[in-house]
Every structure is written in structure tokens, then in C-alpha cells.
Amino acid sequence: MFNSNIPASSLLSIDSGGLLMGGHTPKTPEILNSLIAMTNPLENFSYSSAAAAAAAVSVASSSASCSAASTPVVTVRHFNGHPNGQSHSQDSSHSSCSGSPLDSPAGTATTPSVQQTCSRLIKEGLKLSIQSKRKLSTCDSSSGSEQPHSKYSRRSSNHNGHSGSSNNYSGSMSNANDLDDDCEESSDDDSETKSQPKGLTPEDEDRRRRRRERNKIAATKCRMKKRERTQNLIKESEVLDTQNVELKNQVRQLETERQKLVDMLKSHGCQRAGGCQLPSQLLQSPAQKYLSELELETVSIDGPNSGNNNQRLQSIPSMATFKYGSKTAAAMAQQLPNGYCKPSPSAQEFEHAGYQQQQQQQQQQQPQSLNPAGNNVIDQQHANPSPSLLSDYVPNCDGLTGSASNHPSHNNNNNNNNSSGASSNTSNNNSNISSHSSNATSSTTPTATSSAIEFVKNELVDSQSPYTTALSAERFLFEPSDGFPDIKHACVLPSPCGINGLNMASVVNTNGSTGNNNNSHHNNNNNNNNHLMDFHQGLQHGNIGTGVGVGVGVGVGVGVGVGVMTPYDDEQLLLLKNGCFATDLLSQLVEEGGEYVDLDSATAFMNNGSCLA
């Protein structure tokens, strides 16, 4: 750092001058002047003693103005923690001002002036002060403690060749004189700085701690926001999944209903010649692209007449499923005696139960042929089967199966044939027509009539039917047919001989008069009320025909009929009218089956599935 060619006489002259002046301590300007004198390489070659003295005087005069700038340079150098602050200040000042003369070639005749040197010193001092302030303001302790040492260690290592002379000079100066007050103050400041730890100040540490806390809080908030967004997305996905499942179920249900409706339209028997022709828009499902996801089969496009022959049967439950209103009991009390069977359900009750009655027009379209020459009634109900949805009301007698039986009467060679061909898909009425003719001149006695009734009872008991007792067969005779006619005006004739077993609506000839061979055929014509006897209407030609018919349509028609045809006179008619009492049937029921005695029992009987057996 220092020039090795500097003669020792110059150093000695300064020291001796200082010693001869009576212990005068050199000031900072004097030190700078000596440094400038030492850094001049051409001092021994081209300058004379006078020029050197003049230069020294000019330096001394001008260095006073630079002392203020040189002093902080010394102070800044002491912040770096070197063991010898004064020698290092001289080192640093010399290094800052001796760069250009040493870098310049030795043959140059021009030397830097004192003003240039002072300006350079001031600039370097300002730079160092700014750098020191920046380093102190940083929060990183490692950078603040290592960077100054690295910089100044590089400078010191670059000038290791001149360190020995500087140490000798500093040692001679310390041995000769003590430092002045300024040097003592600067050394005190340096010692205080050295006593402080190399880490951060408390304020910096507090600031750094608060910054870390803020960073932690910000990071926590960021993580919480991300977690909240993730949870919201998860919840939204769950809601969408649930909605997707619900919508799929709704689409599946609607598609199933649509297919059912399309099938219903296809199965409908259209009256037009071309049949039922559905448009292509109805045949193609709106949810065609979702059928694969919904696991539904695609709807096959069939012909317009493909479903005409499809008939859907709908089973009818028992009468216990029908709900009657609050006034039903009173209405039944007015129509029927206690313990008797129920009337037919009304149209409202049918609609409430979800079933439809067959239209009267369809009933009239079904032809029936009646042969007047014989006693055979042929029921043709299979001519035009209806392709529409049918609701055949079947009474609670599902187990009743049998065939049409021919019951021989007590007269000569006369058969009471009852042919019933009922179909559950076509009609809910079985035409049970009973006609009885008397070709003999002998009179019919009540004993013969009662024997015929007993024969019918025995046939019912012996047949495969749920009516296993005579009492059940007797009640079966009073049950209406499957059309449920209103039996309000049906009468039960009391036996004039006191026979309680006569529970049929039969008319007995008691005057022994000769009967005619006139056969009065009563055609049902889909009306089950024709086989009941109404005394409020006029009689035709003195001939009265009564019949009791029971029909059950469960695929196989079963019919039982007993008829008596006798002429009457006015006295007998009056006797018959006066003899029809509503309490006779109740009295007979009390005698034979005493469990049906009041309205509550009849209601319980109705709720029990209307099964009489």
C-alpha cells in the first residue's frame, strides 16, 4: 500500500520535528500532509527542498478545509473492528488517495494536486458513510457482520506488501505521543461499537419479530382461505351429486310413465279404419340420450295396430275396500232389513276405489239370442270383445266354480236350462233367465215347491263352492248377481203353511186351477233388475213370472235358476201384496242364523269382505 522507495529520513524528520516542538501532538491535517508526502513517488527525483517545503505549506493550509471530511473517514474505519484503529485509518486514507499516482506510469511528470486529493478523500468518505448506514439498516445479521470484513479484508490483502511500514509508523507515533481529544473521542466510540454484539439491535430484532409474525399470520390466512375454498367446492360437488341422482330418478320415473302411456295408446282400439297411429314425436323419447345412463331400454317403434289385441285385466278387490260415506248406514237401513246383503256400490264409490263401470252402450251392443221354441237361453257375449281397459267387478266369491246345471222340475219332461257364458273381459253381467212352464193340469202344492227349493240347496251344497251349509246356500240364493241390482222392491213371500225354509221369491198357486201353457220369457238384456218382482207395477194378462238368478263372472259362468209361472186372480194378488212384509226375512234370519240381528252386525258383516259362508 505504501511505496517501498520512501526514504526513512522523511519519516524521521517528521518525528524529530514533532519531538523538537516540545511534545506537540500532530493533528489530523498534519497526518494527512505526511501521508501525502509519503505517497508522492517523485519526491526524491524532480522536486527540490524548497518545492517540497512549499508543497508542504500549501498542503497544510488547504488540509484544514479537508479535516472535517477526513475525520469521518477515520471514524468509519474504526467501525470495522480492527485492532489498531489509527494505523488502519492511515491505511485506508492512503489507499483511497494513492490509487491514481500508483496506477499512473512512473515516467509521467504530472502529479495530482492537493484539491483533487481532498475531493477524492471527501467522496470516498461519503461513500463509506452511506455504505455503513445501509449495512446497519439491514435486518440480516449475517450480511451485516460479514460484508464489511470481507471488503476491508480484500483491501488489506491487496496491500500486504506495505503493511510492515505502516505498522512501524503507527508504533513510532504511539510511542512518541498520545492521541488528542478528538482521537480519544473516536476511540471511545469505537470501543462502544466493539462492545456491542455483532447481531441486530433490539429495535431491529423487535422489527424482525413483528415482521415474522405478520408473515405467519398472512400465511395462515392464505392457508385458511385455500382450505375454505376447497371445502366449499367439496360441498358444492356433494350437492350437485345429490341433485344429479334426484334428477335421474325423476327422469327415470317420467320415462317409465311415458312408456306406460304410449303402451296404453297403442293398446287402445281405435274406431277408425286405419287404427291408432301415433306420431313419431311421441314414439321418440325426449330423454333418448340419457337412457343409457338411466339404464332404461329404448322404446321400440311398433306398428299402429300392434297393440290392438292387448287386453289388460284389472282385478277387483272385495267390497271391504270400498269406502262408504257417513250416510250410508242410514240409506241402507231404509233400503234393506237388518242382516241382509249390501246394495250395489254407487258410481262415486267406484270412482273413489279407482275402478270404472262398463258403459251401458257396450252392454247393449252385445247381442243375446233367445229361442222361444225351447227353454234354452243362449247368452252370446263373446261376439265383440272390447279391447279397452275393463273393470269387471267380481263379488267376494272367487272360489265359486262350477258349470251350468240343468235342474229337473216336478212337471212332465220340462227342463229349466240356464246357460251362462260370462267373460270377465267383456261384461260384468250374467244373464240368468229362469222360465218355468206348467203343461200339466194338476195343481202345484207348497210341498212340491219346498221340495224343489230343498233340491236346489242340496245341489249348491254338493257343488264345489264356498257355500257348504244349507243356510249358506239359502243366503246365496238371495245374493244379487254381479251387476248388484237394487233389491229394494224384491219381496219374500211368507209360506201360508208356516214353512220357514221358503226364502225364495216364488209364487205359489193355491186354488188348484188349470195352468196355461204360456211361457213368459224374461230376457235380462244386461239388466239384472228384470228377474225381481215388483208389485207396484201392473201384471200382464194375469200371468206372473218370477225368477231368481244368480251369476258370477270369473271366466266361467255359473247360474242357478228356479222359476214358477202361475196365473192369479185379484184376491190372490191382494193377498200377495199384503203378505210382503220387510220383517219376515229378518224373523227368518233370526230363527235360522241369529247372528245378523241389528245394523251393527250387518256393518261388521260388510267389513268382513262380504263373505256369507
Swiss-Prot record:
Q: What happens when the gene is disrupted?
A: Mutants die soon after hatching and during all three larval stages with only 2% reaching the third instar larval stage and these die before metamorphosis. Altered expression levels of a number of genes in third instar larvae and chronic inflammation and starvation responses in the larval gut epithelium with a predominance of extremely large lipid droplets and obesity but not hyperglycemia.
Q: Where is this region: Disordered?
A: 77-115, 133-218, 337-446
Q: Which GO terms describe its cellular component?
A: nucleus
Q: Which UniProt keywords apply?
A: DNA-binding, Nucleus, Transcription, Transcription regulation
Tissue spec. comment: Moderate expression in some regions of the larval nervous system, the ring gland and imaginal disks. High expression in larval gut, excretory malpighian tubules, salivary glands, and, to a lesser extent, the fat body where levels are approximately 2.5-fold less than the gut.
Region Leucine-zipper, residue ranges: 233-261
Basic motif, as annotated region: 207-229
Q: Which Pfam families match?
A: bZIP_1
Q: Which domain of life is it from?
A: Eukaryota
Q: Where is the composition biased (Polar residues)?
A: 138-147, 369-389
PROSITE patterns assigned:
BZIP (PS50217), BZIP_BASIC (PS00036)
CDD domains, per the entry: bZIP_ATF3
Give me the stretches of Low complexity compositional bias.
85-105, 158-175, 356-368, 402-446
Give the protein's biological function: Transcription factor which binds to the cAMP response element (CRE). Regulates metabolic and innate immune homeostasis, possibly by controlling appropriate expression of genes involved in peritrophic matrix composition and ensuring the normal digestive and immune function of the gut. Required for the expression of odorant receptors Or43b and Or47b.
Q: How does it assemble?
A: Interacts with Jra/jun; the interaction enhances the DNA-binding activity of Atf3.
Family stated for the protein in its record: Belongs to the bZIP family. ATF subfamily.
Name listed for the protein in its UniProt record? Activating transcription factor 3
